[in-house]
């Protein structure tokens, strides 16, 4: 069930790519949803850090293969951000607003991490201010809207998993 949901969210991320970029006047705005990343981060809280790390590796590899630019960037990034989430959540345990803030901040930082790596390698030429104004913040707003949906999916998935586990 978890794997299937992660596949659906990854497909949703790729599907949103068809709608981005869009033009607003003379500006081209990019929105990059990170539903899969938010799901994996929330899994580290509501399901298990080990399972979340496993999914980060598997789906990081799939995204690396799909993008085909630099192998390992997404895999390493997802695993690292799962550990950041696990560390941060110890501080903000059971506080929804703080958890949402941490997940959205880590999602923004993950996107900035990908941008930085690609920028260093010369694969992206977008200046930093343009990145923040035309991609970073619009993506953050989109991900904030999608967070509620991903949060509900994560809660439902964790309940299904707990119901399927044998009771001792």
Predicted features, each with a name:
Residues 1-168:
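Terminal, non-globular segments
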